[in-house]
Amino acid sequence: MQLRASVLLSFLGLASVGHAGNVENNHNVCTVRANGGHQDDVPNIMAAFKECGNGGTIIFPEDQSYWIATRLHPTLKDVAIEWRGKWTFSDNLTYWRNNSYPIAFQNHHAGFIISGDNITINGYGTGGIDGNGNTWYTAEKGDTQPGRPMPFVFWNVSEVIVDSFYVKDPPLWSVNIMNGTNMRFNNIYCNATAVDAPWGDNWVQNTDGFDTMDATNIQLTNFVYQGGDDCIAIKPRSYNIDIQNVTCRGGNGIAIGSLGQYLEDSSVANIRVDKVNIIRYNEDMHNSAYLKTWVGALVPQSSYESAGVPRGDGWGSIRNVLFSNFNVQGASAGPSISQDSGDNGSYAGTSKMSISNVAFVNFTGWVDTEKSVVSTVSCSEVHPCYNIDYDNVVLYPGKNATTAGTGSCKYTADGGVHGLSGC
């Protein structure tokens, strides 16, 4: 009787070594080699995820550069990914506009989505994703259009570790968690730079660094961001988020929100953000730490992020938030609260989101303003905010100012703001 090699190996108790294109499977360890040039590597990558994505190891070697020309969405379980090489998204804008995975939230799209459980990704300081975003930035020149693919999205995941990884020039948000539980990120670097933009022009809107939504028990440490939007954004239904050691260069700083854009509960609770450097870059650094919610009415919107339909009127609460140890170098504003997103001038103070138990602790540095007010608290007349604490917040209105700035408040509960001069 003649036996095939794979059958004979099974009789001998040995695992076979398989090859599928540029994928080598050695005892449930899949090593993926790039095709080279601008040949699509996604078929080989998906083959590796299929062969070794359940209880195995997947390796992208450091000397390999992969061309991502088509969308991909693997579901993985009990897998370790040694991501030492670089993925580069193709510059085929037409393909991505027409084929990226639609994300209902804010009319966005994704090019690469990971789902599953017990996933470890290590970039070892060399691995990551180049989103080829400069092609988009130059084409749109600051007027973001639908269809840009988010390059690194976690959707329906749990027990995830990501270490020593980068996302360079994302077309849209860099790292996005949507329905994730028990996730740890460490040594993450995100950079969105429009090399063709005139100095002072922001062509990299919507290139958030790290966003969470429907997320619980998320830890982020040692994070560096350069871009033109939220460095970090804590979005609806995020709970138990712990963030430490962050540097934000340019953009909007650390955001809670925006919340209440949709007719749903957008609550957020138990957030700590500690040890943050906020650095002005490209004449752009709008905020340092801020909370933003929508008005309590459906208001017509023209932006693509609202899909051109009325938005707002969401509800919920923001509670137990700590921002501490911020060094602010040239942001346009100090810590702030604004509950009038989406307003057309008729609905100020109507937000249905309540805000309480928020602390800003140990803020130092300067704010790029000619006014004396460096921090504003503008809450909701429907739910006046309370237990808003400022503790050792000393920010100067200008780099050479000698007198610390003050604050302004409205729609707050009586005695609801403590420690902010002017309130």
UniProtKB/Swiss-Prot annotation:
Secretion signal span: 1-20
Residue windows of the PbH1 repeats: 215-236, 238-258
Biological process (GO), any one: cell wall organization
Disulfide bonds listed in the record: 231-248, 379-385
Main location per the UniProt record: secreted
GO cellular component, one term: extracellular region
Catalysis: reaction(s): [(1->4)-alpha-D-galacturonosyl](n) + H2O = alpha-D-galacturonate + [(1->4)-alpha-D-galacturonosyl](n-1)
A Pfam family: Glyco_hydro_28
Location(s) in or outside the cell: Secreted
Organism for this UniProt entry: Aspergillus niger (strain ATCC MYA-4892 / CBS 513.88 / FGSC A1513)
Factors inducing expression: By rhamnose, galacturonic acid, polygalacturonic acid and sugar beet pectin.
Gene this protein is translated from: rgxC
Residue positions the entry lists as glycosylated: 92, 98, 118, 156, 179, 191, 245, 344, 362, 400
Protein name (Swiss-Prot/TrEMBL): Putative galacturan 1,4-alpha-galacturonidase C
Active site (UniProt): 229
Protein family: Belongs to the glycosyl hydrolase 28 family.
The entry's keywords: Carbohydrate metabolism, Cell wall biogenesis/degradation, Disulfide bond, Glycoprotein, Glycosidase, Hydrolase, Polysaccharide degradation, Repeat, Secreted, Signal
One MF annotation (Gene Ontology) recorded for this entry: polygalacturonase activity
SUPFAM superfamilies membership: Pectin lyase-like
EC id: 3.2.1.67
Biological role stated in the UniProt entry: Specific in hydrolyzing the terminal glycosidic bond of polygalacturonic acid and oligogalacturonates.
